[in-house]
Amino acid sequence: MERDNRDEDIMMRGTKQEMPGFRFRLLRPEKKRELWNPDFELLFLLRGRGRVSYEDGEVHNLPMGSIFAINRFQICDLDLDEDGLALSLCVSAETIASFHIKLLKCEVKCQSFFYMEDQQEKFDLIRRDMARIFLEMYKNNEEQPIYMKSRVTALLEDLLSYLSLIHI
């Protein structure tokens, strides 16, 4: 377990971890995430298994590789198994509004755990988008904020294009 934590620290070292309007964070079992926040959040279960519980009482088991969205102000509890590790990307309402105002008026239904392995294509695209944003953080050049914003824009466009949205 100690070795795994060192690997995670190495993974996050060298990144700026926060850019204006969006940020990454690693979630571990011992550190609980807040039940709600004003940001849109996309979570990717990197290791282990977990459970997600929603305010309406729904509880879902999460296999490794699950990706799912937590909409703004949505109450949601995440429990990770002892060896669980999740990557969270939070995008502020202001950032979303500057890219896609339509997304602020919708609830994104991104829950890969509802689909079989042969139905993961659209979620693989979202996983790839998220990985590209994360990798962009490692680049150390003056255009980094521009590239990061373009990657976040691509992710938001893919969410709008490929996943069901409920207008609120």
Residues covered by each model-derived region:
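Generic protein-terminus/edge-of-domain signal
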Residues: 1-63
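A hydrophobic/aromatic-rich effector-binding and dimerization subdomain
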Residues: 2-21, 75-138, 161
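Amphipathic, well-ordered alpha-helical segments in soluble domains
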Residues: 41-44, 125-132, 151, 155-158
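Hydrophobic recognition helices of helix-based DNA-binding modules
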Residues: 52, 137, 156-163
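Conserved metal-binding segment of the jelly-roll/cupin
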Residues: 62-75
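Hydrophobic, helix-rich cores of sensory/ligand-binding and other regulatory modules
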Residues: 69, 105-107, 125, 147-151
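All-alpha amphipathic helical-bundle segments outside canonical DNA-binding/catalytic cores
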Residues: 138-157
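Conserved small/polar residues in nucleotide/adenosyl-binding loops
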Residues: 166-168
